């Protein structure tokens, strides 16, 4: 199984990255998990113009990556518990998670995804969302493989 996490974010090295890398390492027994931070010139320019332009730039950046089973993280997405989250990624060859930028996603992009979920009703920094997401991926893989971490 391959799991990709795509985030509209400038790459930085910080304590969050250490935690994310640790969850990726622990997950490697069950799946190949990779995080891809994307912040290109098109996105940077669009974010100085406004919301619609930014959402369009996010869509244009992400749409070529839509393959396998695609899950968008969106504030208006379905709230799921850990078991439902685990079911979303169970028995999939490739899963792609898409984290939007500051302005969220266009409705058209969300409609192209297989699932749209929310990690929480709380607003989180992108790095915090990545920590939560990588932990939930590891927890889900443990559930699927009867590993005691979840208990």
UniProtKB/Swiss-Prot annotation:
It catalyses: pseudouridine(1915) in 23S rRNA + S-adenosyl-L-methionine = N(3)-methylpseudouridine(1915) in 23S rRNA + S-adenosyl-L-homocysteine + H(+). It comes from the Bacteria. Pfam families: SPOUT_MTase. Keywords: Cytoplasm, Methyltransferase, rRNA processing, S-adenosyl-L-methionine, Transferase. GO terms for cellular component: cytoplasm. It is found in: Cytoplasm. Its EC number is 2.1.1.177. The keyword Cytoplasm applies. The keyword Transferase applies. Gene3D superfamilies: 3.40.1280.10. S-adenosyl-L-methionine binds at residues 73, 100, 119-124. GO terms for molecular function: rRNA (pseudouridine-N3-)-methyltransferase activity. It is an enzyme of class 2 (transferase). Belongs to the RNA methyltransferase RlmH family. Specifically methylates the pseudouridine at position 1915 (m3Psi1915) in 23S rRNA. Homodimer. HAMAP family: 23SrRNA_methyltr_H (MF_00658). This is Ribosomal RNA large subunit methyltransferase H. It comes from Aliarcobacter butzleri (strain RM4018). The gene is rlmH.
């Amino acid at each position: 199984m391959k799991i990709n996490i795509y985030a509209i974010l400038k790459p930085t090295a910080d304590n969050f990255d250490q935690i994310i890398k640790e969850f990726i390492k622990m997950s490697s027994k069950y799946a190949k998990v990779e995080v891809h931070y994307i912040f290109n010139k098109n996105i940077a320019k669009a974010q100085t113009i406004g919301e619609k332009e930014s959402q369009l730039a996010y869509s244009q950046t992400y749409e070529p990556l839509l393959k396998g089973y695609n899950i968008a993280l969106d504030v208006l997405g379905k709230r799921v518990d850990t078991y439902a989250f685990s079911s979303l990624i169970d028995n999939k060859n490739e899963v792609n998670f898409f984290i939007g930028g500051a302005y969220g996603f266009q409705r058209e992009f969300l409609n192209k995804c297989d699932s749209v979920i929310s990690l929480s009703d709380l607003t989180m920094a992108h790095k915090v969302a990545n920590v939560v997401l990588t932990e939930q991926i590891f927890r889900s893989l443990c559930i699927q493989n009867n590993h005691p971490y979840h208990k």
